[in-house]
């Protein structure tokens, strides 16, 4: 079996994501090398922070094309938090174009009375692709851990894999299209449910090898 690459582009602490993957049964390789991404059997793109620095850091490391090629080649791919948002065409938070792998935009939560932004803490997922391999073994409407002020708004509603409701706003919490999966919440901070999701991804990686 080859290796799973966790992309390091200076956007947040990769330690907890890697620890979660190790618990799920795989030893990830942290890398910012285009060649590693080309050779990897599967890819995880984590990240916390702001949209513009994230895409700038990816492009300055020449990682945009290897990421696009890996997804096009059918390699299992998991984006986490900011790693979901930069797959889209752009963000209300910044001016830089995103990777544009998924059509749509990243939007900010609308202000509401008594609504806290960022959306932070435990909240329930509602599955929109309930048969997704990533969700295997989870109870319906599981609680996972969120920290975000922006959410993705895909043009094609069929890429939605789960939604979450914050105040009166129900927004995308996860997307899935073929081998490409990405989540707004933090599986590595989501206790048993998060570990189950990472384990499901690792199972897909092993089945794909």
Region roles according to the model:
Residues 49-120:
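Cysteine-nucleophile active-site neighborhood
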Residues 1-5:
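Extreme N-terminal starter segment of soluble prokaryotic enzymes
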Residues 141, 176-180:
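Beta-strand-turn-beta hairpins that frame and shape the catalytic cleft
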């Amino acid at each position: 079996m080859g290796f799973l690459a966790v992309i390091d582009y200076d956007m947040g602490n990769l330690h907890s994501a890697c620890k979660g993957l190790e618990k799920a049964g795989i030893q990830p390789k942290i890398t910012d090398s285009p060649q590693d991404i080309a050779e990897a059997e599967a890819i995880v793109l984590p990240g916390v922070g702001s949209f513009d620095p994230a895409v700038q850091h990816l492009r300055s490391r020449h990682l945009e094309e290897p990421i696009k090629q890996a997804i096009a080649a059918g390699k299992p791919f998991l984006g986490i938090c900011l790693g979901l948002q930069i797959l889209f065409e752009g963000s209300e938070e910044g001016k830089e174009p995103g990777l544009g792998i998924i059509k749509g935009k990243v939007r900010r939560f609308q202000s509401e009375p008594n609504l806290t932004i960022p959306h932070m803490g435990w909240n329930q997922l509602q599955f929109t692709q309930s048969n997704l391999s990533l969700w295997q073994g989870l109870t319906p409407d599981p609680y996972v851990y969120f920290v975000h002020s922006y959410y993705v708004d895909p043009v094609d509603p069929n890429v939605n894999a789960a939604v979450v409701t914050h105040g009166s706003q129900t927004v995308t919490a996860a997307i899935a299209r073929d081998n490409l999966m990405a989540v707004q919440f933090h599986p590595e901070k989501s206790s048993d449910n998060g570990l189950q999701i990472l384990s499901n991804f690792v199972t897909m990686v092993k089945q794909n090898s």
